[in-house]
Amino acid sequence: MRQTSVARLYEDQGPRLQLTHVSGPLDAVLSVAEERMWPADLVGHLNLIHPTRLQVLGAAELEWARRQSREKVAHHLNGILSARPPAIIVADGCETPNIVHGVCTAHNVALFSTPHPSASVIDQLRLYLSRQLAEKISLHGVFMDVLGIGVFITGNSGAGKSELALELISRGHGLVADDIVEFSRTAPTVLEGRCPELLKDFIEVRGLGILNIRTIFGETACRRKMRLRLVCHLERRQPGQDDPNRLPVQQEQQVILGVSTPRVTLPVAAGRNLAVLLEAAVRSTILQLRGVDSTQEFIDRQSRMLMGDGDGL
């Protein structure tokens, strides 16, 4: 179960949203127990159907409450707060009504106020929770920023991942993480990779030991995070192993946290410039993201030639 607390939310987002703690404990928990439930579902406008959400009251909700009888408003508020939502936030700079304060106190629910618009508060908290409570996984490899594309370099121990990363850094690309990469699924089709705090800025290269990339190459050689766009697997051929497919019609894919990501396999051999090959793979990926598929273009050209339409090349 992925979870965070109201206290942590208040600490992280309080200054940005100018949250004022009016009353109530901060020990309530926001948790995601089901994979099909996204963290962004944990916050929204005042809602009787989803009473367990973090509830945000804006000017529209308070205007509706003013037109109703006190008994009706109290009935609805008690119905919502009896489900123990993590907190109530009064937004739009509105003054907190006494009835809201009283019901929150009676049910021991945290109450906050903010001058920010309710829609802005919800958007900001949804973004925060989607990152804070995202599905996470740690994988072995090197994560790089190559030409603005997040590339995850994998391979067996001794395949040359760190050496390739060092070569790419010397060519002006950026390091995100070496050895262990933490991936988070921040949206249905988005994987974001970053480095554990302990390993940040460091890379380990056989024969050289541990190097501080930020100190050696400067601030621009390191990245805080990147979106994963390509997996590059380094494969050292074993005796008797078949040659890799030279003309793959279907692009290889790797699934991480349910998100499918393009993958290329680069055979490792003496004399092969893997940095150049990886840069070419990244440029090809950029073209594919724009709808340009070089392999399919070649197949189409060959088909036209076989059909006797060679003049149309």
From Swiss-Prot:
Name the encoding gene, please.
Answer: hprK
Could you say which enzyme class this protein belongs to? transferase
Q: Which cofactor does it need?
A: Mg(2+)
Positions of the UniProt region annotated as Important for the catalytic mechanism of both phosphorylation and dephosphorylation: 203-212
GO molecular function list: ATP binding; magnesium ion binding; phosphorelay sensor kinase activity; protein serine/threonine kinase activity; protein serine/threonine/tyrosine kinase activity
- For this entry, the protein name equals HPr kinase/phosphorylase
> Domain notes, please?
The Walker A ATP-binding motif also binds Pi and PPi.
Q: Which HAMAP family match?
A: HPr_kinase
Task: Tell me the residue numbers annotated for binding Mg(2+).
Answer: S162, E204
Protein purpose: Catalyzes the ATP- as well as the pyrophosphate-dependent phosphorylation of a specific serine residue in HPr, a phosphocarrier protein of the phosphoenolpyruvate-dependent sugar phosphotransferase system (PTS). HprK/P also catalyzes the pyrophosphate-producing, inorganic phosphate-dependent dephosphorylation (phosphorolysis) of seryl-phosphorylated HPr (P-Ser-HPr).
Q: Which UniProt keywords apply?
A: ATP-binding, Kinase, Magnesium, Metal-binding, Multifunctional enzyme, Nucleotide-binding, Serine/threonine-protein kinase, Transferase
